Amino acid sequence: MDLARKEFLRGNGLAAGKMNISIDLDTNYAELVLNVGRVTLGENNRKKMKDCQLRKQQNENVSRAVCALLNSGGGVIKAEVENKGYSYKKDGIGLDLENSFSNMLPFVPNFLDFMQNGNYFHIFVKSWSLETSGPQIATLSSSLYKRDVTSAKVMNASAALEFLKDMEKTGGRAYLRPEFPAKRACVDVQEESNMEALAADFFNRTELGYKEKLTFTESTHVEIKNFSTEKLLQRITEILPQYVSAFANTDGGYLFVGLNEDKEVIGFKAEKSYLTKLEEVTKNSIGKLPVHHFCVEKGTINYLCKFLGVYDKGRLCGYVYALRVERFCCAVFAKKPDSWHVKDNRVKQLTEKEWIQFMVDSEPVCEELPSPASTSSPVSQSYPLREYINFKIQPLRYHLPGLSEKITCAPKTFCRNLFSQHEGLKQLICEEMGSVNKGSLIFSRSWSLDLGLQENHKVLCDALLISQDKPPVLYTFHMVQDEEFKDYSTQTAQTLKQKLAKIGGYTKKVCVMTKIFYLSPEGKTSCQYDLNSQVIYPESYYWTTAQTMKDLEKALSNILPKENQIFLFVCLFRFCLFVCWFVCFFLR
């Protein structure tokens, strides 16, 4: 690997050091590989971990790495097994890790495969599927809260999507709830609005009696807490984000601190200076909450913080912390969404704006894909790949003499010229395709160039094999001896795989193998590198049927720019005109 590029990647990869996630620079896989460091694996082993904080940190590292790869075209997670004698088939992974995967994914086996290789454990991650109309991005936690009767609960991805879609459709909502017509009072009929009204009266009082019984309980609009004075500041700081988010995203409500489980007024003792500090903490905490607006007004979170005096026989003995939060016009987060991707060769957390863009956009957002080549720049597509789109049209197909009719080479003109100039290449292709039952071999002057990467002028050509019963193979042919082409081939294969999923819309598991051949001036050939002999994939990555071949070819055409699609339309139109002219000529 080029030293400058390697140092660049190492610096950026380790920027996620807080999470202990780095990009593996020495992998043989043509994949984006994230290294999560040492991890204890196995259900019993993880249960026995004395350091609960370490177990939680390992879980977060692995989960965030999975999330990042799901949102970045897929890849592989590499973990060094911490505990000696670990066996995947005997010990499993660990229930806490499994639960994290289940909470993130609709069906884990569709996205993840697990494999132990010696002292290393690999998780193969398929790109997030765009088959359904659900969320377009994987998320560990939306960080959007709502009130569910007496609880503040974080919205799952589906609930968050529905909430955000409604907000987008209506352009936000009014701060004040709609007023309903007054109803005739009915004896013994109680509704939740009665509890909210009683809580409002309680909030507006100036004095409370010690051990006074409440006339209301917790509800959608009321939350009651009681903390010891020693941890009061810490606990209020911890709970404010989720309760403010929940009340603001629902219909507003009240938070009271200083009331016990028996619904009695207890209060907490505090000096005036401490109350001032509590007020500042409340202001700062609410002011830091991320919000996203769908409305034009772009207002702020409306709230009122008070301290209600608690009196025992006329003597002030404490205070009740009272917070009223109005319903918000749009969306209030407790913190940034817990959703990750790989961007600029770093594992990064999405901002609320980026995350919402992915969530509410009806069309998938085609973000910049992570690439090992920090210096590569987008360039125009080369002509051979344009022809590939049309290779199914009979005149553009080419069957190499000596090969089965089921093996198609394309594009025709490019292949003929290539084989006529390089007899050794023609013979090599015949040998390589001998074991292929059915497939398409798509040649290009440079697949790297076709994918928007830099061209290596020392490469003679590339060829992509899409065949039945084996993964796609990217062949690289060159005529420069003692030259290193592994990085070029790996980078091209990795980018191809990512674009098939993120832009092409391919929804199944896929890997791209690489094979590099040297062609001597005398026409002799030698294999310099074969990825298939270097790495092992789970069995599910080798299942390639006739249908998956069609899906791959379709995805491949989708990764090309629109001008190439227009080129296809023009070719088809001309072909149809020719057929019509031909038929009319013979019908005269």
Swiss-Prot record:
Membrane spanning stretches: 566-586
InterPro entries for the chain: Poxin-SLFN/SLFN_N, Schlafen, Schlafen_AlbA_2_dom, Schlafen_AlbA_2_dom_sf, SLFN_GTPase-like
Main subcellular location of this protein, as a coarse class: membrane
Compartment annotation: Membrane
Membrane topology: Single-pass membrane protein
UniProt record similarity statement: Belongs to the Schlafen family.
Protein name: Schlafen family member 12-like
The organism of origin for this protein: Homo sapiens
